């Protein structure tokens, strides 16, 4: 995998390891088989990593269009029973961090991973895809670090339960 604009290259082996590490991080924050994970990002390296990580553990990747406005984002998150929303800021003239705070004002006061929202009862996590830190959100480095607490056997167990008939992607 090559991202020439970022001077970044992954061999398939390196990508596989990064995906496993990301999958373990997702498991650490409660994502498992059947969990709905929204990814609101354009073509950045960890979009691919998150997509494959979801697929490996049987989570359902929910496509979030980068052109969505506030009402569309809120409808999607509510209607899809989204558990975790992964965001990248600054895509296509939108401020996804601010839109997320508008949708989930509880993020500003809750502990990461313990979101409780009446409007979005399934939503527990928001992950900022990048190194920036935002109140109430994990960032990529923190997710990868949390994954160190997940045993390889747990990842292997979830991977073994994935079936070719499982839903891998939900699109709106």
Predicted segments with their positions:
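Structural core segment of the AMP-binding/adenylate-forming
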Residues: 29, 57-145
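Short hydrophobic segments within beta-strands
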Residues: 2, 40, 86-87, 129, ...
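ATP phosphate-binding P-loop of adenylate-forming
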Residues: 165-172
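Conserved S/T- and glycine-rich ATP-binding loop of Class I adenylate-forming
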Residues: 37, 54, 85, 167
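Helix N-cap/beta->alpha junction signal
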Residues: 41-43, 89, 166
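Conserved AMP-binding/adenylate-forming core of the ANL superfamily
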Residues: 1-52, 69-74, 141-148, 159-162
């Amino acid at each position: 995998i090559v991202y020439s604009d970022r001077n970044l290259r992954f061999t398939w082996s390196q990508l596989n390891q990064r995906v496993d590490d990301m999958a373990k991080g997702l498991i650490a924050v409660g994502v498992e088989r059947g969990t709905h994970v929204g990814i609101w990002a354009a073509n950045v390296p960890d979009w691919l990593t998150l997509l494959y990580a979801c697929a490996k553990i049987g989570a359902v990747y929910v496509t979030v269009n980068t052109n969505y406005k506030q009402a569309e984002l809120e409808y999607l998150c509510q209607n899809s029973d989204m558990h975790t929303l992964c965001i990248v800021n600054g895509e296509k003239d939108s401020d996804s961090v601010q839109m997320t705070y508008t949708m989930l004002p509880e993020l500003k006061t809750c502990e990461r991973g313990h979101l409780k929202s009446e409007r979005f009862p399934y939503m527990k996590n928001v992950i900022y895809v990048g190194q920036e830190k935002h109140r109430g959100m994990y960032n990529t480095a923190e997710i990868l670090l949390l994954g160190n607490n997940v045993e390889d056997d747990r990842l292997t167990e979830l991977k073994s339960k994935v079936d070719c008939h499982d839903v891998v992607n939900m699109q709106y």
